[in-house]
Amino acid sequence: MKLVFLGTSAAQPTENRGLSCICLEREGEVLMFDAGEAAQISYMKSGLGWNKKMKIFVTHLHGDHCVGILGLLQTMSMQNRTESLEIFGPSGIEEFIAANIKVLNFGLSFPILINTIKDEKIFEDEKFLIRTCKANHSIIAFSYLFEEKDKPGRFNVEKAKELGIPEGELWNKLQNGNEITVNEKIIKPEQVLGERRPGKKIGISGDTMPTKELEEFFEECDYLVFDSTFLEAEKQKAQDTCHSTAKQAATVAKNAKVKNLVLTHFSARYRDEVEHLREAKEIHDSVITAKDLLEIEIK
């Protein structure tokens, strides 16, 4: 599983930064959070693949977070995508996409399903779930939390051999949590598996001011990607525009007992993120500043 940053600039692109777009790739599936203008260019550079199982989660309907969906859909069609795609977002997301497809008069080579956020839990399958929390921004906006479900413990090869279990399909069944029968004896998964491994938690703030609700929402995340548009010197500007400073992001992470903080969404006024990193590290020990095409392996 890995995080891939496709765009890390706020409001407008720079020579080195595209607009907001973050991907979480796991087991051949891509979960994309926001898609600012030209997201398809960074996506192409990432090598993530055009026909993978995919879901797009939009935090809010400001152009630097959603306009890139249109180009992404068109490019995927030109690449002959056939896999269906789901899109989740705030009220208005369906009208936004449908109107643009109609006006631009382009067809898609694959089906899309658009979901308007109405509940806290918006997606769940046997391996993970996605929850939302209202962010504090200038328009309706949501933060997202990816929660991986606990995984089976590590498979003990030596124990399996001692029990006379032939390698292959029966090993796979045990690893998937199923009982098997060997020589008329029932063997339970716990006989060959270690303790269950806790799943990972990854938070994506989108554009927001810091709030106590978000601190609770992101509690004990393994990684938290948080709005860091400004430095402390522009704290008033952050408040006026409903964004956060790097130091405020670090404070949220510290209070939420987050293991690793990733700063992103930097204002184009800054040439680099040296000061963002310095200010955040005054509060939290483990801080990364995101760059376009940065990949973070999550183990």
UniProtKB/Swiss-Prot annotation:
Record flagged with keyword Repressor: no
CDD domains: RNaseZ_ZiPD-like_MBL-fold
Annotated GO MF terms: 3'-tRNA processing endoribonuclease activity; zinc ion binding
Record has Metal-binding as a keyword: yes
Active site: 64
Similarity-based family: Belongs to the RNase Z family.
Protein name per its UniProtKB record: Ribonuclease Z
Lineage of the organism: Archaea, Nitrososphaerota, Nitrososphaeria, Nitrosopumilales, Nitrosopumilaceae
